[in-house]
């Protein structure tokens, strides 16, 4: 019998697949995995059909449709006042997770190190380790989940080749300030460290806050891959569409890998998003999600959960349950799904060592009736 190498077998099945499967098994309301349960913008559907009818059904150019890359450049000029070369700095990818893996593969060699802020999206560390490199986790400081910059300085060695960050942050909902970026720039100034900026929730910031992108920081932009997701901005996660913005030399390295993996990305979907971005009528996802966050926070007051800080960004809200149970967060999340019909994500899953502060993550990117049904269940605790 042929024995295949067990590449990254230690990670097992992701917590998102586990909890969504458990929700389906028990007929629970799924507030675990980060996806909306409401329709996409009707205009986006129309543009997708239009793309098919017009013949956008064959392979797209390897970097992505020129019309989409230009639409992205125009969008960033309008929203962030930055100039981006659509031909040499933007590459369309089959989702942001693919973009993160490809960027890490362009950066890392065996024996290198990459700094990860925890809690962290669960693909980061496997992506690093699958490239033969070592992940160096640094915990964010609770309860505000801020960066301890002294720990960052202490963690840097001659082998440090990358730092990955995520703002707005999954799962905590925090956002980086310009001061954070300035501090990071000072720390990496005389190094060969590359920054990987995961900005998939960049359009989801609340309470008048402003998302500050790495692309707006000239010094850091020169050493950064910035990763984005159409799924988060257009509520179409199943399309698996994202993009990477990086300096031309970084983009060349990224595309050398991309051409031999995915090569190209769903062509009619690229057409549809390009038309949607260029139409000037794209829905205000920020206002929609902020209203959902506020509604969910108001509803949560009728439950025994404790909210220490409303999410500043993303579509996730953390909550503690000290007045309900002393179970660990994984056991509690499983119990909540099986016995009370609401699926969440235990935050310990976002730590390499399963550090457990007894916090769970809710996704509020749901229809009002979905959130209200979930609260009805949770209010019985």
What are these regions (language model features)?
Residues 112, 133, 190-194, 221-222:
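A short helix->loop->beta-strand "cap" motif at the edges of active sites that frequently abuts
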Residues 56, 254-258, 277-298, 326-328:
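Structural signature of PLP-dependent enzymes
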Residues 136, 140-207:
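Active-site phosphate-binding strand-loop segment of PLP-dependent enzymes
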Residues 210, 216-253:
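Active-site PLP attachment segment
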Residues 5-95, 102, 276-279:
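N-terminal small-domain helix-loop-helix segment of the aminotransferase-like
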Residues 153, 335-344, 350-381:
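PLP-dependent enzyme catalytic core of the Aspartate aminotransferase-like
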Residues 106-128:
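Conserved PLP-anchoring active-site segment centered on the Schiff-base-forming lysine
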Residues 270, 274, 289-297, 308-321:
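Conserved glycine-rich beta-strand-loop-beta hairpin in the small C-terminal domain of fold type I
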């Amino acid at each position: 019998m042929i024995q295949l190498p067990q590449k990254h077998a230690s990670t097992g099945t992701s917590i998102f697949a586990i909890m969504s499967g458990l929700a389906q098994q028990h007929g629970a309301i799924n507030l675990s995995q980060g996806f909306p349960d409401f329709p996409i913008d009707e205009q986006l559907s129309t543009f997708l059909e239009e793309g098919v009818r017009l013949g956008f059904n064959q392979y797209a150019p390897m970097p992505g449709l020129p019309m989409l890359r230009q639409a992205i450049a125009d969008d960033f000029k309008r929203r962030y006042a930055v100039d981006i070369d659509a031909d040499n700095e933007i590459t369309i990818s089959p989702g942001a997770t693919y973009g993160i893996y490809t960027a890490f593969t362009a950066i890392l060699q065996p024996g290198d190190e990459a700094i990860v802020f925890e809690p962290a999206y669960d693909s980061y560390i496997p992506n690093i380790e699958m490239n033969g490199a070592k992940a160096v986790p640094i915990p964010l400081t609770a309860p505000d989940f801020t960066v301890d910059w002294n720990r960052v300085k202490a963690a840097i060695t001659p082998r440090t080749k990358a730092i990955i960050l995520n703002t707005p942050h999954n799962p905590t909902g925090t956002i980086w300030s310009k001061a954070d970026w300035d501090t990071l720039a000072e720390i990496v100034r005389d190094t060969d460290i590359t920054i990987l900026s995961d900005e998939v929730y960049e359009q989801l910031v609340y309470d008048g806050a402003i998302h500050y992108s790495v692309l707006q920081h000239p010094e850091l932009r020169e050493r950064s891959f910035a990763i984005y997701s159409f799924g988060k901005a257009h509520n179409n996660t199943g399309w698996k569409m994202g993009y990477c913005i990086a300096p031309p030399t970084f983009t060349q390295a990224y595309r050398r890998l991309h051409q031999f993996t995915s090569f190209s990305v769903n062509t009619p979907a690229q057409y549809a998003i390009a038309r949607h971005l260029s139409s000037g009528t794209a829905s205000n996802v920020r206002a929609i999600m902020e209203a959902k966050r506020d509604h969910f926070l108001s509803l949560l007051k009728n439950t025994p959960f404790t909210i220490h800080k409303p999410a500043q960004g993303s579509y996730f809200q953390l909550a503690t349950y000290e007045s309900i149970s002393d179970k660990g967060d994984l056991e509690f999340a499983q119990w909540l799904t099986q016995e009370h019909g609401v699926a969440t994500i235990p935050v310990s899953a976002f730590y390499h060592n399963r550090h457990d502060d007894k916090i769970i993550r809710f996704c509020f990117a749901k229809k009002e009736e979905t959130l209200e049904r979930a609260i009805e269940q949770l209010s019985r605790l």
